[in-house]
Amino acid sequence: MAEVDDRIELDWDALEVGETFEKFEYLLTQEMIDTYRKGVMDPEASFPTIAHKVDVRQYNNRYTDAGSVNARCAFHCYNPPVAGKRLTVTAWIADKYLRRGKNYIVTEAVSVDEDGRLIDRVITHELKQPSEVGKKWGG
């Protein structure tokens, strides 16, 4: 039996800045850290949390849309996460704006560990009309 997709179709006009998503929790394992380090070819890489796209995971669980193009992303890393600790990610709509007739949303996500240590903050600007990419060059 097919799974029902109960996500909401994104209505950019109705989207509210400040909307907070359900918290996402996961256990960061040593295997996750090792896989990340292998992927970035750095045996001492400290922030595997950025590899999981936890900043937009909860948005994607709530909304469906035509896709997006990352316009800008900022990662602020504070304390390296520790294997075996449970991480909680809180994400929200931080902003939305119209630029050159195109709709953008800004999601912000903060990760903390089970001890309350701030791990990272990720701010992502997304163009919510991916079909617009390349039009200025005749694409």
Model regions and ranges:
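Well-ordered beta-strand positions in beta-sheet-rich domains
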Residues: 25, 74, 121-125
